[in-house]
A protein has these predicted regions:
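Loop-to-transmembrane helix boundary motifs in multi-pass membrane proteins
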Residues: 17-24, 97, 173-176, 190, ...
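C-terminal membrane-solvent junction of multi-pass transporters and transport-like membrane proteins
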Residues: 4-19, 86-94, 248, 439, ...
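TM-loop-TM module centered on a large, flexible mid-protein loop between adjacent transmembrane helices
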Residues: 161-174, 209-210, 334-341, 350-415, ...
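Transmembrane helix-boundary motif of multi-pass solute transporters/channels
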Residues: 26-53, 92-202, 307, 316, ...
Length: 623
């Protein structure tokens, strides 16, 4: 009996090792294929989405899920302890109206402004200005709508961390619409953080050495300056992500200083650029040589593209737990001593004021760039167009000044975006959509996602941020309708603002498909996949294994009928495996093997459970 037991344990250990090895192989094949597809999105985009593309995508998804399950089930005794915060939310009310407003403006006037706006206004002229105005109007309406919903929640003593909280209260934590709103906002903030990291790397390691060399700072001094800025950026990230509670007041003061300097530099630079061009707006009102429907459509599409420059006011709602219940208001509280405003009111004022100030700065800078008339070819060829405009029109000192503004914008945008993404992931964990382990270590998973998304390139990150945030904001706006219970009709006149804003956001998101269909497909599929992962998590061990086994076999048949080659991923492959990894042949093999192993595991588990003796029911004397 003892020998049989030892043999059984040895067989189980061998099975675990083989299962883990198969899981690693499946994950490697899936990672190679996904890296190739991501590289294709970054370089070429995607004009069509054929049946073969769909089959390949489903195959990669099935391989990723199956490989993860095989590897995880084979090593159940391994536990990875991630540095984490307690899952239960904690309040640290230290920020007042001024700090909240500074954080909102800093999150909105981010590094994308320096790359997107100069090129967009040079290329699209009046359409760009109209798009900025339309995006500003939409954001003001959204801020007002969110302010009303926030007031309703706080008046009733409900949590209101982030805009998706409105959807959660209106529809419940198990609503698919709530999940889409929360997850979309998490992806949007993660993509924005990845974009900030990407352009920061381009600036520090590509542009800054050349700028320093122009002032005679080459060699070791330039290396030290680059290293110092990199260390400061890393220290700012660590302070905000890991030491936020300890240094929360210092972080708020730093955000206030950074944002103030950023706004002053942008306003001064805009005035100088406009003065250099004589504020000559000749030709600005010349509409494109196309039909009215064409340029109206172009304006709508461009509005969706530029909305990235305005949605930072959403970060204010994520600071509900860090904001004081009452706060003085600058100037008014100086005149009326002791005057304070409740959080329910000053949050709404801060959101609207953020959009108004950001819109004024964005439009003023866009008009200044237009009248400065820089070389369109030079702007298009520049890695950071705002720096090129400053150098070519105003000279080197102003280029250095706008470079400082760019660094400040990166600091004020990256960290709020990263923290907002982390808070959204944690909220999904609190609501049961994610395992508590993932929620507690949310900052690590967001950081890994930033590294992954950064490989997709700047254009993809801008578009996916726009698409996901517009989808989320559309649902959040409509939550104001769902929140109202005292109604006689499905939609009433008082719902006009919420319905108008929500539908406008969803239309703008749909319009992005015209420009970047790959982004719309990627965003929509990512939402479906994320909800699928939640469903699998909810199924339990047996249900997940059975589902993935069936998915693997079905996908194997699908790939046999519609084979496809993967784009070169740009990552090394083991010698002799290039042919298998470059097409769906290798993917089909690992899917078939994974499906068979999962079926065997499912059957063995069912048989083992059936063989277990039923639990003994203790005898009782009865009532």
């Amino acid at each position: 009996m003892a020998d049989a037991s030892r043999a059984l344990r040895a067989t189980a250990r061998v099975a675990h090792v083989l299962t883990a090895a198969l899981g690693v192989v499946v994950l490697v094949v899936a990672a190679y294929g996904m890296a190739g597809e991501l590289n294709a999105l970054r370089v070429e985009g995607m004009e069509t989405f054929s049946v073969r593309d769909a089959a390949a995508f489903v195959g990669l998804l099935a391989a990723l899920l199956s490989g993860s399950l095989l590897l995880g089930s084979a090593v159940p005794r391994i536990r990875i302890r991630l540095p984490a915060r307690p899952l239960a939310p904690e309040d640290h009310p230290v920020y007042g109206f001024t700090t909240i407003l500074a954080i909102g403006i800093g999150s909105t006037l981010g590094s994308p402004l320096f790359l997107l706006l100069p090129l967009n206004v040079i290329e699209y002229e009046i359409v760009s200005i109209l798009s900025l105005t339309l995006a500003a109007i939409l954001s003001i309406a959204m801020a007002k709508n969110n302010s009303d919903s926030y007031r309703v929640l706080k008046t009733n003593g409900l949590a209101a961390v982030g805009g998706p909280a409105f959807v959660r209260v209106a529809l419940g934590t198990r609503s698919a619409r709530y999940f889409i709103a929360r997850f979309s906002m998490a992806v949007a903030n993660t993509a924005l953080a990845a974009y900030c990291v990407l352009v920061f790397v381009v600036f520090v390691f590509g542009y800054l050495p050349t700028l320093l060399a122009a002032y005679g700072l080459g060699g070791p001094p330039a290396y030290y300056i680059v290293a110092m800025i990199t260390v400061l950026f890393a220290a700012w990230f660590v302070m905000n992500s890991l030491l936020e509670r300890r240094y929360i007041r210092l972080i708020g003061r730093a955000q206030l200083v950074f944002t103030s300097l950023l706004v002053v530099i942008l306003v001064v630079q805009s005035w100088l650029l406009g003065s250099a061009g004589g504020w000559n707006f000749r030709g600005l009102l010349a509409f494109p040589a196309a039909s009215p429907l064409d340029w109206i459509g172009a304006t709508i599409v461009n509005t969706g593209y530029l909305y990235l420059l305005f949605f930072g006011f959403q970060e204010i709602q994520a600071l509900d737990r860090e904001a004081r219940d009452r706060s003085p208001i600058p100037v008014i509280s100086w005149i009326r001593r002791g005057y304070t405003v409740s959080k329910e009111r000053y949050f709404g004022v801060a959101m609207v004021a953020t959009v108004l100030i950001a819109a004024a700065v964005n439009i003023f800078y866009a008009l200044a760039v237009y009248v400065a008339n820089p070389s369109p070819a030079g702007v298009a060829a520049s890695q950071i167009p705002a720096l090129y405009v400053a150098r070519s029109v105003l000279g080197g000192p102003q280029e250095a000044l706008i470079a400082l503004a760019f660094m400040l914008a990166t600091f004020t945008t990256f960290v709020p975006a990263f923290l907002a993404a982390t808070r959204h992931i944690r909220s999904l964990g609190e609501d049961g959509f994610l395992p508590h382990t993932v929620a507690r270590g949310a900052w690590i998973f967001v950081l890994a996602a930033i590294v992954f998304l950064a490989a997709a390139g700047q254009d993809f990150l801008v578009s996916i941020t726009d698409y996901m945030v517009l989808v989320s904001l559309g649902i959040i706006a409509l939550a104001a309708v769902w929140l109202r219970r005292d109604r006689r009709a499905a939609v009433e006149r008082k719902d006009s603002l919420a319905v108008g804003v929500g539908l406008s956001c969803l239309v703008a998101a749909a319009a992005l498909y015209v420009v970047t269909p790959s982004v719309a497909v990627f965003g929509s599929v990512s939402l479906a996949v994320a909800f699928l992962v939640y469903d699998l998590y909810d199924l339990g061990s047996l249900g997940t294994r059975l589902f993935l086994a069936v998915l693997d076999v079905v996908t194997f048949v699908l790939l046999s009928a519609y084979p496809r080659a993967f784009v070169a991923a740009g990552i090394p492959v083991l010698p002799g495996l290039e042919a298998a990894a470059s097409g769906t042949d290798g993917l089909r093999i690992v899917l078939l093997l994974g499906g068979l192993v999962l079926v065997a595991s499912f059957v063995a588990d069912v048989v083992a459970r059936a063989a277990e003796p039923p639990p003994e029911i203790p005898d009782g004397d009865g009532p």
